[in-house]
């Protein structure tokens, strides 16, 4: 099948205008001690843009850090079962701080509904991205479908 990459990022005005097709802009939000973006059991942060994978719309549901855990969830239009192997690369747009997170087996969870997994296996750079100091800042998220 090959390597499929989705860029979830902001295209700046200097490089051609508003948010480009197949990209997201994620703005870090906060609710209590929870930081990131979520539309599952909370409304935190913002995301905009249009992303497709294999011709189907992808929706970011959650990229949220709380108490040592990073929750990650997304949906693929028309898909309601199965599992994926994805790598998520995060880059804080302000200063270029980045980190990579592996989700080798992210299963579809009907209660979300969507592909959902959490991890505690995070670098200190990733942990620092999700902090009070970065609320309102932009984060670039690259999802690599392996």
Q: Residue ranges of each PLM-predicted region?
A:
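Enriched but not universal
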Residues: 1-19, 25, 31
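Transition segment at domain starts
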Residues: 23-61
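Beta-rich globular "head" domains
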Residues: 48-86, 90
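Solvent-exposed serine/threonine-rich low-complexity stretches and specific carbohydrate-binding patches
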Residues: 99-113
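Aromatic sugar-binding surface patches on proteins
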Residues: 112-125
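Short, exposed beta-strand-loop hairpins at the edges of beta-sheets
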Residues: 126-134
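Short, surface-exposed ligand- or partner-binding patches at beta-edge/loop junctions that are enriched
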Residues: 136-142
